């Protein structure tokens, strides 16, 4: 939909509800929740009427982008882990290592001005923690789907540019390593979202009914994820 010089893209979710709702999220996504059976023309009319309000909120959220500044990997800089900020403490050591001690990322390198080395060490630490924490999160989320007699997917972890997670047709659940920066509840949300695709490949009404059933507070978790990592 075009409003002035801007094109507004929106996603429609059909759900068992009586009224239509429009929401603008911090990441710039516009979501329309409509009662099952609502005609597309009716949705378009509502969006056109609310176009000014939608653009106002999109502009509001844009002022905060990018939320995370470019990282320099120097002492005193803050980095996220499981939703909390920790400062870097860099010191000289015989071998490179990263430890999380008393609210600090304590990084040892052979040269204090080696920001590239600090970055590599921290990313390797994140990858190691992601492997462990994501497996724990998966085990928390899986029982709800095991009851549905669905095939257990294989878990894969790697860095992804544009997605937090995905589920392949071959049954591989891939999670973005960077998700380790988010709170545990948000990691659980991403995993649960992808697991719902085992039964519902698209984002139709059945998908959201299942998501609502296994995780009633999924919208709050999604919102918190957007606030933390957008």
Give the residues covered by each predicted segment.
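Active-site-proximal or metal-binding-adjacent scaffold patches in catalytic folds
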Residues: 1-189, 198-230
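Walker B catalytic acidic pair
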Residues: 194
């Amino acid at each position: 939909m075009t409003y002035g010089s801007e094109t507004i893209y929106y996603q429609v979710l059909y759900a068992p509800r009586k009224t239509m709702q429009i929401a603008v999220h911090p990441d710039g996504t516009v979501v329309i929740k409509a009662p099952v059976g609502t005609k597309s023309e009716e949705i378009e009319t509502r969006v056109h009427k609310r176009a000014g309000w939608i653009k106002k909120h999109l502009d509001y959220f844009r002022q905060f982008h990018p939320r995370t500044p470019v990282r320099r990997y120097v002492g005193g800089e803050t980095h996220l882990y499981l939703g909390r900020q920790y400062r870097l403490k860099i010191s000289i050591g015989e071998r490179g290592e990263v430890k999380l001690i008393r609210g600090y990322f304590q990084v040892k390198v052979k040269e204090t001005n080696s920001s590239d080395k600090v970055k590599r060490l921290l990313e390797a630490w994140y990858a190691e923690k992601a492997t462990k924490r994501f497996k724990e999160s998966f085990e928390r989320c899986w029982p709800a789907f095991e009851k549905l007699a669905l095939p257990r997917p294989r878990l894969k972890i790697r860095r992804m540019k544009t997605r937090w997670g995905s589920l392949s047709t071959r049954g591989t659940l891939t999670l973005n390593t960077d998700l380790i920066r988010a709170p545990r509840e948000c990691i659980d949300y991403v995993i649960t979202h992808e697991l719902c695709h085992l039964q519902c490949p698209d984002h139709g009404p059945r998908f959201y009914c299942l998501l609502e059933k296994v995780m009633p507070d999924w919208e709050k978790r999604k919102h918190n994820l957007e606030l933390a990592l957008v």
